[in-house]
Amino acid sequence: DPVLVGADEHIRGMPEAYLGAALELGYDELCAEADLRGALVIPAHIDRTMYGVINQLGFLPEGPYAAVEAVRPLKAGAGRGYTVVTGSDAHYPEHIARRPFSLDLPEGWQHGGVVSLDAVREALAAGRARLPFST
């Protein structure tokens, strides 16, 4: 069970609620709500054996996805035609940036040091991601 630990490394208490499932929303509801609020909805590591949506549900459900993230090349049709990106999902410092990807962004992708999510959304929709592997 998780415990609350202070800066001095001493246990300060136990959480009052189970934190393993912090949301009461289902997958479809969460994706729809994120999209409604302008987020880029990108299901993560959809191909993982543990916790990947394809292995949990048997398929990738339809959704308002800007892209999908995969650990390795996907089987034909598994990504339902969405642009595939990669990420590290690092649990150890040495795993940070081990699966980078690049994205060709359009003119005007940044304004005053702020990245335009619309520019990222446009580049993902156009399939302008370059991966460390072929899909």
Across the structure, where does each feature detected by a protein language model lie?
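Alpha-helix-centered segments that form part of catalytic cores
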Residues: 1-36
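Charged catalytic cores and adjacent phosphate/nucleic-acid-binding surfaces used
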Residues: 1-2, 7, 18-19, 40, ...
